Amino acid sequence: MDQEAIYEKLTEIFHDLFDDDSIVVTPELTAKDVEGWDSLAHIRLIITIEKAFKVKFSTTEIAKLEKVGDLAALIQSRA
């Protein structure tokens, strides 16, 4: 799966999960940039992404994620 397809699907997930179609998903996007992205939303986001991309992340991998670009790279490495 290429980066464009990953970001397309991530954008859909972010819009749905945060109920905000104005979110622009970029590699530099972080939790600080999205209203409502707290620890609980983060867990829901990871679970939703795992289901959508049919992948499973370890706790260590999740803890290392700092921005959406890191997440997209992790997804691509599993695809």
Language-model region placement:
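Phosphopantetheine-dependent thiolation modules in NRPS/PKS and related acyl-activating systems
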Residues: 2-36, 40-79
